[in-house]
């Protein structure tokens, strides 16, 4: 097993552990919504500190249900991941193309390859 394969396997296991451990350990069981978003957590904290607080901004679009909101968030995350993957793939492809071009030009310019005249 190569070094890169081991690193990739360890990273995959770490990501899986981060996803599964909160569920297995029951983190958040004491809450009504165990895995609420940051917005809901912030709203709860603000109303505990200042019960009369009035928000100065409201969302432009309020999704009809939590499922639709989750689907839109997942779509946004997928699009972001696609953009990042495209960028890193493009960068890697360009680097590999430059390496191949320099290797090809280096092989063509090698003095031992030139035919000798009599």
From Swiss-Prot:
The keyword Transport applies. Keywords: Cell membrane, Cobalamin biosynthesis, Cobalt, Cobalt transport, Ion transport, Membrane, Transmembrane, Transmembrane helix, Transport. It is found in: Cell membrane. InterPro entries: CbiN. The chain crosses the membrane at residues 7-27, 70-90. Residues 102-118 have a biased composition (Low complexity). It holds the Pfam family CbiN. HAMAP family: CbiN. NCBIfam families: cbiN (TIGR01165), PRK02898.1 (NF002780). This is Cobalt transport protein CbiN. It comes from Streptomyces coelicolor (strain ATCC BAA-471 / A3(2) / M145). The gene is cbiN.
